[in-house]
Structure formats: C-alpha cells, structure tokens
Amino acid sequence: RVIVGAGQINFGSPEGPWNHSIRLERKLGPRLHVVALIDPVRENAEKVLRQKRASSAMSSYRDTAVYPDMHAYLATVTSDTRPHVVWIGSPPAFRGSMHEGCDIEKMLADALPGVGVFLEKPVSTSSVGDVMDVDRYIDGKLGPVSVGYMLRYLRVSQKLKQIISDNRLRVMAVNARYVIAYEHLTKQWWWNKSQSLGPVIEQATHFCDLARYFGGEVELDSIIAHSLEHFESPSGLSKLAFDEEACIPAEERVPRVTSATWKYESGAVGSLMHVIALHGRDFFTEIDVFADGYSLRLCDAYNAPVLYVRRPGDDREEVYKYDDDDPFFSEVAGMIDAVEDPSQRHRILTSYDDAARTYAFTWAIRRASEACVAARHRSP
C-alpha cells in the first residue's frame, strides 16, 4: 500500500475519530505493507513513521520509504513494489484536476493502471468542470475508486436505505440540518473561503451527499439559497477563537448560515440548513426523509447515531441504535475487499462519479447563495 499525506486524516488526531492507518492495520493485520509514505514535509512523515515503528504495527511500516511527491515515488516503482491500493488523504487542493501539480488521479491512471484508489472528500478544490474531466479520464483506467463519505457507511444510514428499498418507498421530501459548534474550530483556513471553499463545500458536503443518497439526483438549476453573511446584524460569534477582522479578508469570510431548497429529478423536494452557532464541542445534525406513511429521522450522525422510524399504522417511533459502529472501518474494509475481490465492488458506497456529483451539488448551493447576496446588494 501507498499512503499519500502524513496528516491527521491518515494518522489520527485528538480532535476526532479519523485515522485511516489504524483501520487499515485492523483490517489487514500483518498483511499490511506500506511501501511508501508521500508528504512534502519530510519531518511530518518521519514523525508518524517513528510512532508506527514503536507500535504493535511496526512490521507494516518497517520498510516504508518517504517521498516528497507522487513524481518522486512513481519513478521508483517496480513490478515487485507495485502497490495494490493508494490511500490519498492529502489536501483536496492537490487533486481533482488535469492540471499539473493537481492531477494525482491522472498520474496514477497513467503510471499504475488498474490500481485501487481511496480519496478523501471533497474530491477537489478545483472547478466542477475540472472534476468532471478527471471523472471521465479515470473511468476504466483505475481499479476500484472509493471516496470518503463515511456517513453512508453508518448502520443507521444503511437501515434507512433498506427501509426505503424493502417498502418500495417513493421519497417525497428530505430535510437536512447541520449546526456546528465553532468554539474550538481554530484553524483559520476553514474560515477563509479562498482556502476551504466555504462550509457547505468543505463540511456540509457530508449531508449534501446523504441528501442525494436517500433522495436521488438533484436538479441543480432548481436550487434556491439564502445566507447570513458576516456583515449582517445577527452574524456575531462571541466565542470565535481569533480576530477574524485582522486575519481573514472581508470578501473571504464564511457565511454564518446557508439555507437551500431544491427539487429532485423525481419531483421530490429537498432542503439543507448549515449553521455556525453552537458553543462547546458537539454538533447538532439531523436529516429527515418522508414518504407516504413514513417518517425516517437520522439524528446525531457524528456522536451517537440513532434512526427513528414511524410507519403506517403506528404513531409511535421505532428506535434503531447500533453499539460500536465505526463507519470509518466499514469504509476501509469495503475498499480493501473490493480491491482483493472484484465481486465485492458493491461494498464501495461512493464512487468517484458519485462524489463528483455531490461536489457539483455543493458548488451549486454556494453559487445560488452568492447570487442571492449579489441581487440584494443591487436592489435600490
């Protein structure tokens, strides 16, 4: 295996549950052999390797070589060292296009045809057109490709999908709410739209993806969105951990609220509200799916996921909870199984094409909200 990126998504952080390497170790055990770790900051790569070599997973990293970039690594690959899968947790600014320096998918398709590739979300920070170009280029050239929309792998998400399928439900409406606790969100790049692309594309993308997963394809031209901008009266954030006025250019500050509605291709209606408002650490997240006779309510997706189901004939809600559910592990295990056995490709729940559609959806919401802001400013 090859791991791209020595940062928190691949090697863990006290801030959250993400840590792909530890799930790979759990899935593969002694069969895991990481031949390369690619990161432009060699000290970071060496640091995580020292930690791994001092752990019970030492044998998986004993011979891992460090490379500054994909070009340097690919120049060394032989038939004996050709990887089965490349695990990409590097920032999205360095992938998702056909432009040199941001074309890691193209490089892998050309140099290692048939290799499996896992990518974190969002697929890029480039344009939607660039991402669609990549989608077309890698089709049929790479092996299994999985993108890290891990909330699809929650057992409550799968139960919700099963209920829709088993009962042949025609979804009427999807309503998603994503309210973040911002007090400890100190990374200034997140608050800068020129770097993060804003909270819908960078963060609410998970719920936009679930909205597509449960409701179907969205008519992008139907999207209407409003936002609460940093300069509007209710936008003050009393617990912001840094001086936004001194650190973030006014035109790049993120909206405090984004509220969007849309039509699905099926005719159903969808909505999303992303809010930067809560103090403390825990987010409020909830997504409702309605069909004739049914209310399906997925709550607290990040902390303690629960699915509440109301069915025809009973006004009381059924409650579904699953102990020790690790969607990150299910995501990793599904990818590895698909790489090792082509008959298991259905275990991958988000393909590159699927993730590209979610990316286009999030950009359409941002553009719609910006158009609304611009229109209000033009009004006399």
Predicted feature residues:
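C-terminal helix-rich "cap/oligomerization" subdomain common to oxidoreductases
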Residues: 38, 53-59, 82-90, 334-380
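N-terminal Rossmann-like dinucleotide-binding module
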Residues: 1-57
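Predominantly a Rossmann-like dinucleotide-binding segment in NAD(P)-dependent oxidoreductases
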Residues: 7-9, 151-249, 372
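Conserved acidic residues
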Residues: 35, 84, 172
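Beta-strand-loop-alpha-helix segment that lines the small-molecule cofactor/substrate pocket
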Residues: 85, 91-152
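Short amphipathic alpha-helix with an adjacent loop that forms part of the alpha/beta core around
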Residues: 70-83
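Contiguous beta-strand/loop segments that form the cofactor/metal-binding neighborhood of enzyme cores
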Residues: 195, 202-304, 332-339, 364
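Short acidic-hydrophobic, aromatic-tinged amphipathic segments that line or gate anion-handling sites
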Residues: 59-73
